[in-house]
Regions:
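Positively charged, low-complexity/disordered segments
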Residues: 3-7, 208-215
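Active-site-adjacent loops and short helices of periplasmic peptidoglycan-processing enzymes
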Residues: 1, 5-8, 12-136, 143-147
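Penicillin-recognizing serine hydrolase domain
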Residues: 72, 97-207
């Protein structure tokens, strides 16, 4: 558990044990996307092209088709609410030319943020034995997201969004059941188990809980 105000760990249990990040990977994909938005490299209403590679991603996905176009804003909402693997790959390919190249940037940025035990191999968190992180590193990423991109951080509290006339609801049940919870991301693969980064104001501070995995 990390205090946002004090910027330090206040409770810990095996914070440096290597784990598979599963869909917590998407928080870094979004971090780099928000950085690109801040720098004017992309805009929320820009159209992104969907490749066959992205369209063929395993679930969870939005159901994109090769050759179609999708807005940056929709991709972001789909990552946060539905944890859409196809949308993560779309962002990666449009920002990094290939997903593998984007993953190298993800790892580089992670190390710059002090996430020394993290390696990314894809943008969505689908199984890869070389893709690893720790609870401590995920706490650092969550803090960096809040402090560097406060204007976008509120998106992590989205409970639903609309795509093609259909309302899609969040996987993050803590947003529905814990008063004050304001994000961030859940994840699951068979190899990783269930994991989560969540945050909420408590008394005079704001606590972030990254757990990899939780049961």
């Amino acid at each position: 558990v990390r205090s946002r105000r004090q910027r330090q760990m206040c409770i810990r249990d095996r914070p440096d044990t290597l784990r598979y990040p599963a869909s917590l990977t998407k928080v870094m994909t979004l971090y780099i996307t928000f950085d690109a938005l801040n720098k004017g490299i992309i805009k929320m209403n820009d159209d992104l092209k969907v490749s066959r590679h992205a369209a063929n991603m395993a679930p969870s996905r939005l159901g994109l088709r090769p050759g179609q176009k999708i807005k940056v804003k929709t991709c972001i909402e789909a990552l946060i609410v539905k944890s859409a693997n196809d949308c993560a790959s779309v962002l990666a390919e449009n920002l990094g030319y290939t997903e593998a190249n984007f993953a190298k940037t993800m790892t580089k940025v992670a190390h710059e943020l002090g996430m020394k035990n993290t390696t990314f191999k894809n943008a969505n968190g689908l199984p890869n034995k070389a893709q690893k992180t720790t609870a401590r590193d995920m706490a650092l990423l969550a803090a960096a997201m809040y402090h560097h991109f406060p204007q976008y951080y509120k998106l992590f509290s989205l409970k639903k969004f609309t795509y093609n006339g259909k309302t899609i609801y969040t996987h993050n049940n803590i947003l529905k059941t814990f008063a004050g919870a304001d994000g961030m991301k859940t994840g699951f693969t068979n190899a990783a188990g269930y994991n989560i980064i969540t945050s909420a104001p408590v008394s005079y501070t704001h606590l972030t809980l990254p757990t990899t995995p939780y049961v």
